[in-house]
């Protein structure tokens, strides 16, 4: 589609681009040629090619029931109308249809749920940053936009992106345009299409890591919408797209096996896009920083002799979202699909996406994720259908070593003479002194940034001579080396929840600091050491954005001021937790958790994690511990650290601590740690 036509479509919302049905099962689409734009098979690995064709669709099938969102998509002129009209009005909010469509552009309409009375609307903008890469220019732009148009903070997400909260409707076009013009994008960060593609954020210069990151960027490019709606709405049709690798263009255009809508501005998505959100992660063996098994597609680099990438293992069918008290909805781990040579990865991913596009449910969005399709069909049938779109049989899944959670916090060698520094950001919220210090360092040393799937941030390409001054600046703002951060905090995550998320039913980000402090107090009470930890994740609703169902201890919003407790995930995020107890009030957490921590301390096997312990003993036994709990049998030895020698100092510290939801001892220890870190001036790690 030409830029002039796109601009005309924006000026005249009634001007229609020819309509292409989003499903091949529709009779109108059945006559389209399936072999246009085909690519000679010689450009790909020729092993195991077989003659295949897309399964025939019934011409007489009655039209299936569709959800309201499917109707909005069909009538939207490729995600333009009525959003383009709504953006021209003075109303502070969007219509129902436009509220759904703006998600495809990377934004959600929200309102402050702490306020009573009339709603104060604003918008959250989420960027799209494959493998978490953020240029120096884009970071500084986002920092500016947060102050000028947001709430003064940046939020790092569990999918390696930024969230900018509090943008009012009249400023949306300015903010979106600024992001686009400064090497950023929010296209496809939300909505029924492929979301941000994850990959290990660490800038390690090795063949496998570099190949994983390149692959994530290529998959993201392959599945980026092509019809121009994003640029039409926000920058009047002007395109700001970087040149794509030829293999991406070739894979997108290939229609050898009936994957594409010919002559459509959206060759992969059509008018209907996907039934629901779609998530992909790429990684290397052992590195599970991306929670690989929680994605619709998990892609794992397989290397040969000398570390040279040879191909990929593929997992399919992961997903977190569920609905309380509906057993037909559930979190699910991805399972092995097969292996593909490296030159075929884009074709294999496209075949999986098209299988979901054609067969995922569009009548009830609670069951529209690909995990439900695979659960219904079984992996063998799913594999067979994907192979028909792929044009080959998948090779056997290659063996892999054990997965590990890797945070990449602290100082590390990149492998090219430079250093990178991983910084822990509690709940991904960059604010206050931390925000100021990060800007100072990133701007002064012209650093690029990587965002991690654990809501943290990595500064990259640092010269050795800069390590000491950078450490000093960061530590003075509370950005500490990992040994000064409570181990509970390092692996903990929470979604934003209240006050802005419309789906939240209880606190998450605002509640987790006090909950982690209480868990630390419980650890001390039952005799667990400071360096011991459990993976804690909290969400304000059952959608599971912070992936609580993979945690050793997951707290999931279960009504106002209450949580559903999930137990049994593993510390390396390879097993799924199970629902343990419903409707637990925050004030009752000690009654439930303290006996569990005590018996873990007393009855665990050598190096047994809390999650593994809860699985081994079983929920019946754990509930028995809770019912019979009367406190620790023997009070543990406590360190008697007398930090305060006079009452005035204590009262002053206590007053400051209460402002930060801490006690005097906790704040004093934090001050001491900051002082020590500051005076180390970057010595050691």
Curated annotation (Swiss-Prot):
Cofactor(s) required, per the database record: siroheme; [4Fe-4S] cluster
Tissue: Expressed in leaves, stems, and roots.
Reactions catalysed, as given in the entry: hydrogen sulfide + 6 oxidized [2Fe-2S]-[ferredoxin] + 3 H2O = sulfite + 6 reduced [2Fe-2S]-[ferredoxin] + 7 H(+)
Domain of life where this protein originates: Eukaryota
A GO CC term assigned to this protein in UniProt: chloroplast stroma
EC number: 1.8.7.1
Pfam families for the chain: NIR_SIR, NIR_SIR_ferr
Cofactor remark from the record: Binds 1 siroheme per subunit. Binds 1 [4Fe-4S] cluster per subunit.
GO MF terms held by the record: 4 iron, 4 sulfur cluster binding; DNA binding; heme binding; metal ion binding; sulfite reductase (ferredoxin) activity; sulfite reductase activity
Entries under PANTHER family matching the protein: SULFITE REDUCTASE [NADPH] SUBUNIT BETA, SULFITE REDUCTASE [NADPH] SUBUNIT BETA-RELATED
Role: Essential protein with sulfite reductase activity required in assimilatory sulfate reduction pathway during both primary and secondary metabolism and thus involved in development and growth.
Protein name: Sulfite reductase [ferredoxin], chloroplastic
Record organism: Pisum sativum
Lineage of origin: Eukaryota, Viridiplantae, Streptophyta, Embryophyta, Tracheophyta
